[in-house]
């Protein structure tokens, strides 16, 4: 998504922008895209009554009839009957028609509608990583009878599901390894850090609630030595650790 929006940040740069910022700092344009997709995976994001105000802020789309129309369509499709993927494709096309300047909004709503239709407790970011830019451009032009976009959307979700399943298997294996190593840890905040590493993509080795900065660094060095986590940056300073 960052690249589609003309940004140059890769995964490592986005991770650094998010996890190394201070509370209240602007994570930058790329970091704001990451923020929108982190919000997608939160349980609170499922509440359609908050979509208009939250999406306006997340995607920097001004309030107006266009955004209202898209959100109303999404809320309607979220509780409808029929194919979940077809509903996701429909809301994405509607979003690109009404708010053509914001492709990420269309993909966010597609995943959200899909999650509602499938009765998931929260949404998962799926289509954005698999949809092709050319197919996305066609979506805003697709008519009601056009089959190009629905098929492209279905294929993207099929690829996304396979990729998500592979990632799940890998993360479960890595999380199990961390949990096996956890009883061997003796540092302050060790239990808290293990919980954070299970829940978050990355964690800086900074001071915790009771542990010093030095103690925290030793904890992460121990976890790396045990093969429980990886150092993700390759830098000697401002390091990040994760599964």
Residue positions per predicted region:
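FIC/Doc superfamily catalytic core
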Residues: 1-243
């Amino acid at each position: 998504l960052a690249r589609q929006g003309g940004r140059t940040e890769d995964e490592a740069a986005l991770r650094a922008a998010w996890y190394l910022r201070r509370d209240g700092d602007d994570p930058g344009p790329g970091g704001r895209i990451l923020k929108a997709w982190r919000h997608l995976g939160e349980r609170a994001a499922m509440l359609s009554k908050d979509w208009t105000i939250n999406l306006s802020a997340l995607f920097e789309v001004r309030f107006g009839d266009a955004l209202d129309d898209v959100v109303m369509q999404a809320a309607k499709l979220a509780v409808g009957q029929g194919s979940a993927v077809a509903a996701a494709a429909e809301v994405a096309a509607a979003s690109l028609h009404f708010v053509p300047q914001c492709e990420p909004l269309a993909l966010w709503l597609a995943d959200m509608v899909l999650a509602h239709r499938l009765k998931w407790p929260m949404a998962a970011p799926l289509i954005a990583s698999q949809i092709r830019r050319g197919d996305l451009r066609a979506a805003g032009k697709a008519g009601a009878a056009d089959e190009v976009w629905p098929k492209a959307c279905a294929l993207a979700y099929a690829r996304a599901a396979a990729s998500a399943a592979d990632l799940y298997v890998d993360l479960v294996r890595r999380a199990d390894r961390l949990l096996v190593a956890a009883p061997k840890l003796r540092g302050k905040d060790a239990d808290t850090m293990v919980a954070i590493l299970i829940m978050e993509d990355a964690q800086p080795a900074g001071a915790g609630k009771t542990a010093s900065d030095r103690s925290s660094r030793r904890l992460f060095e121990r976890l790396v030595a045990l093969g429980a986590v990886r150092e993700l940056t390759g830098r000697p300073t401002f390091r990040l650790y994760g599964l």
